[in-house]
């Protein structure tokens, strides 16, 4: 079991090319990377912000908690939790740095959530990848090893408060070592897969993995 409070510098990256995709972005006030005292925490090409910018490709979903569920889908099998069942699971508080592909980084962010390890304990599988699926039809792909062994959570609180819908509430994926688009907002489950399948942004040219320290913003980076 990992400690209840963690600190991570995180690592990741990504890209998009279609003019048909619209963005909603606000709240950015940044400082250049070269003004930071501890450069080891800020990946190349990133600026530190004290705000929490909002970036979405569509409308913000507002799912009532009594209608919310989270599922692990493994072929024809599905393990599902209601909101109350999910909140009854053991949770962890983690403090991590996050890095957006749009070049902002926010340091020392504090979240509370359920470890993906806790959820996967309920399912027998031999999967190598997961595809996160969310309200609004958004998906993103990740290697299983990047969401297990204490690397990822389904987060329901930020800075001690319930997670706002604009930041992915009631629950979002938190995978801080990868670019933040991999921490999918409004997450509703994980599909376990033997092969890697591109998600939403990945089909528009973003990198399949997204390591910010290697600046993997776009396919081919």
Map each language-model feature to its residues:
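Structured, non-membrane catalytic/scaffold regions adjacent to prosthetic-group chemistry
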Residues: 22-221
């Amino acid at each position: 079991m990992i400690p209840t409070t963690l600190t991570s510098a995180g690592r990741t990256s990504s890209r998009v090319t279609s003019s048909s995709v619209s963005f909603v972005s606000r709240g950015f006030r940044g400082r250049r990377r070269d003004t930071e005292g501890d450069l080891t925490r800020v990946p190349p090409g990133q600026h530190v912000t004290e705000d929490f910018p909002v970036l979405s490709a569509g409308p913000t979903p507002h799912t009532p908690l009594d209608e919310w569920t989270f599922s692990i889908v493994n072929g024809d099998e599905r393990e599902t939790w209601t909101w109350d069942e999910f909140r009854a699971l053991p949770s962890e508080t983690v403090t991590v740095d996050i890095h957006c592909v749009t070049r902002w980084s926010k340091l020392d962010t504090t979240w509370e959530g359920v470890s993906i390890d806790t959820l996967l304990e309920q399912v027998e599988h031999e999967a190598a990848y997961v595809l996160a699926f969310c309200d609004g039809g958004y998906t993103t792909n990740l290697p299983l090893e990047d969401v297990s062994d204490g690397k990822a959570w389904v987060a329901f609180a930020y800075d001690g408060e319930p997670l706002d819908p604009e930041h992915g509430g009631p629950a979002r994926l938190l995978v801080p070592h990868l670019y933040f688009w991999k921490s999918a907002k409004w997450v509703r489950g994980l599909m376990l897969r033997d092969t890697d399948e591109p998600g939403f942004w990945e089909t528009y040219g973003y990198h399949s993995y997204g390591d910010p320290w290697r600046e993997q913003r776009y396919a081919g980076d």
